[in-house]
């Protein structure tokens, strides 16, 4: 599993060294947007927390232009497309309700501090996240991906809705300003299903075996639901690097 702050190059980038602390040219062109790949699963509570912290960090740094790319990671790649009863999943994943309750209690407490309401008791099914990831990928064409991701997390973890159900997904898409008919037509097809599985495989090949994971400028990665201050520090490092190497969008 990736370390908390992994400052290695996970993409094939040159081995040029960078000297920090030098003079900055204030007349330099406006920096390109910093590319951030958000590797996540929509059924992962830690991803909900991590994404919330990332977006909160970015909101307080309007000086830092970024381009978000939402990359799927399948924690349950063998999950039936129709999902499974929550009780069966908890037994298979945690070995019983008691262990799950302890874990969920800890996550719920952390969520409260972030303004995230986890209501695990409302969940009746554990869905496959493939179609939800497909919908996010589709929504990115219309600039709605970040909004949709947060809406999907809230629907699943707060409202207990089945985000593997097509009617639920269409309703959530519509609530984010997307056309319900177009969303339904897309989900009814097989479009991007192979792409979701390919992106999941790519993440594993990069050495990512846990989420959330934020890959910044193809050179650095930060794993886990880190505090905003930790995220911000790495973003600043990557932004300085980008000025020297021309790494960006």
Q: Residue locations for each model-derived region?
A:
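Generic alpha-helix initiation/capping and coil-helix boundary signal
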Residues: 4-5, 104, 132, 166, ...
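Extreme N-terminal basic, low-complexity initiation segments
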Residues: 1-11
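C-terminal cap of thioredoxin/glutaredoxin-like
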Residues: 18-20, 25-32, 38-39, 43, ...
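Intrinsically disordered, low-complexity repeat segments enriched in small/polar residues
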Residues: 11-13, 21
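Structural alpha/beta surface segment adjacent to cysteine/selenocysteine redox centers
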Residues: 51-159, 245-249
């Amino acid at each position: 599993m990736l370390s908390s702050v992994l400052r290695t190059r996970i993409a094939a980038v040159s081995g040029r060294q960078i000297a920090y602390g030098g003079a900055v040219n204030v007349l330099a062109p406006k920096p390109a947007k910093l590319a951030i790949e958000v590797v996540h699963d929509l059924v992962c509570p830690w991803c909900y927390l991590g994404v919330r912290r990332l977006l909160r960090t970015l909101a307080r740094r309007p000086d830092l232009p970024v381009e978000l790319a939402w990359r799927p990671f399948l924690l349950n790649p063998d999950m039936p497309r129709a999902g499974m009863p929550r009780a069966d999943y908890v037994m298979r994943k945690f070995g019983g309700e008691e262990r799950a309750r302890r874990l969920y209690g800890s996550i719920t407490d952390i969520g409260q501090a972030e303004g995230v309401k986890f209501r695990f008791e409302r969940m009746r099914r554990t869905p496959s996240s493939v179609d939800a990831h497909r919908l996010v990928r589709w929504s990115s064409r219309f600039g709605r991906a970040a909004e949709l991701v947060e809406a999907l997390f809230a629907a699943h973890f707060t409202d207990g809705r089945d985000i593997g159900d097509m009617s639920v997904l269409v309703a959530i898409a519509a609530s984010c300003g997307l056309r319900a008919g177009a969303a339904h037509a897309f989900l009814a097809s097989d479009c991007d299903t192979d792409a979701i599985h390919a992106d999941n495989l790519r993440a594993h090949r990069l050495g990512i075996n846990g989420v959330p994971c934020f890959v910044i400028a193809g050179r650095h990665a930060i794993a886990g639901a880190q505090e905003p201050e930790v995220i911000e520090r790495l973003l600043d490092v990557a932004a300085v690097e980008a000025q020297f190497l021309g790494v960006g969008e």
